[in-house]
Design a protein with these regions (language model features):
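Active-site mouth loops of central-metabolism enzymes
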Residues: 1-17, 66-76, 186-197
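Hydrophobic faces of well-ordered beta-strands that scaffold small-molecule active sites
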Residues: 2-8, 31-33, 61-67, 91-95, ...
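Active-site-proximal loop/turn and secondary-structure-junction residues that shape catalytic pockets
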Residues: 8-12, 35-39, 67-71, 97-101, ...
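Glycine-rich, proline-tolerant flexible connector loops at the mouths of alpha/beta enzymes
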Residues: 29-52
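N-terminal active-site wall of soluble small-molecule enzyme domains
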Residues: 46-91, 100-103
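Catalytic alpha/beta core domains of metabolic enzymes, predominantly
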Residues: 118-245
Length: 291
């Protein structure tokens, strides 16, 4: 499943609605938002999240909101009496650290709950089990990291996700956007530090290989080209390549990698059959070994 983010620090506009519709048409099925706000903005935030939830219902999109204990208090919400939360139209909550796990376990019988994947421990799992949490409503979601050099290490992430998957959790992580980046740093919002600067599709493909069940765009938007590339990959497994100075015969075509995969190049199944790029004989030269 792929999703995207819509933040509530600014008013929701017709452009926001149009972007959501374009993403839904491209195959995205979930929206993430954040309810971490100053207390004096609580009324405005409540109005905006209700509006966002209404748009999500119209577009058949799930809506998960990140919230802390401070955010709950500012909005006048309590996990013990979740009627006000459900009234907004939220699909579920992504729970920040510091919120009582017994209350989380109880909430899981009412709505989906995403736990903090990066900090979840075996003791936390034991507490949730002791409080009879509904495991069909529990998932494990990682953070994004706005500041360069602070994102997660790939090896650590792979190990943590393997553990979470073994426990039965669906995991989620963020990939960077390539459109409007979220401020104030505007340095992209990936989960893995190695993905900072990558295209959304490249990061998505990498996360899919690391036990990641849900993948969301962290930044405000992605470009129409990225939307189309992700839609093609999710629908057919096709990877869209953008190249410059390529022969016209190569562009706009569907190509397949050979089953005997080469280490350093892509060898096309169609290469011999089509003979699109005949090459004149040249003196043989040794290829330097690349480790």
């Amino acid at each position: 499943m792929v999703g995207f983010s819509v933040y509530l620090s600014a008013p929701l506009t017709a452009a926001t609605r149009a972007y959501m519709q374009a993403m839904q048409a491209a195959g995205f099925s979930g929206v993430f938002t954040s309810l971490h706000i100053p207390e004096d903005d609580a009324d405005v935030l409540a109005q905006r999240v209700t509006q966002l939830a209404a748009w999500c219902r119209e577009l058949h999109l799930e809506l998960i909101a990140d919230i802390s204990d401070r955010g709950l208090a500012a909005l006048g919400w309590t996990l013990a009496a979740p009627q006000a939360i459900l009234a907004t139209g939220l699909t579920g909550l992504r729970i920040d650290d510091g919120i009582d796990l017994a209350a989380v376990a109880k909430l899981s019988h009412v709505m989906p709950v995403a736990l903090n994947a990066s900090t979840l421990t075996s003791d936390d799992v034991a507490t949730l089990r002791a409080n009879e949490a509904d495991w069909s409503h529990l998932e494990a979601w990682h953070n994004y990291y706005p500041r360069p050099e602070t994102g997660l290490a790939r090896d650590w992430y792979a190990e943590k996700n393997a553990w979470l998957t073994k426990l039965g959790f669906t995991t989620m992580a963020f990939v960077p956007g390539d459109g409007e980046l979220r401020g104030p740093l505007q340095q992209q919002l990936p989960t893995l530090e190695s993905h900072r600067g990558w295209s959304p599709l490249a990061a998505l493909v990498d996360l899919a290989q690391l036990h990641t069940g849900r993948i969301y765009i962290g930044d405000n938007t992605i470009t129409p080209a990225a939307q189309a590339a992700i839609a093609a990959y999710c629908a057919t497994g096709t990877i869209t390549l953008h190249v410059t100075a390529a022969p016209a015969a190569l562009t706009g075509e569907l190509w397949h990698n050979r089953p005997d995969v080469a280490a350093q190049v892509v060898r096309l199944v169609e290469g011999r059959k089509r003979q699109l790029l005949p090459t004149a004989p040249q003196p043989a030269q040794a290829r330097p070994w690349v480790r």
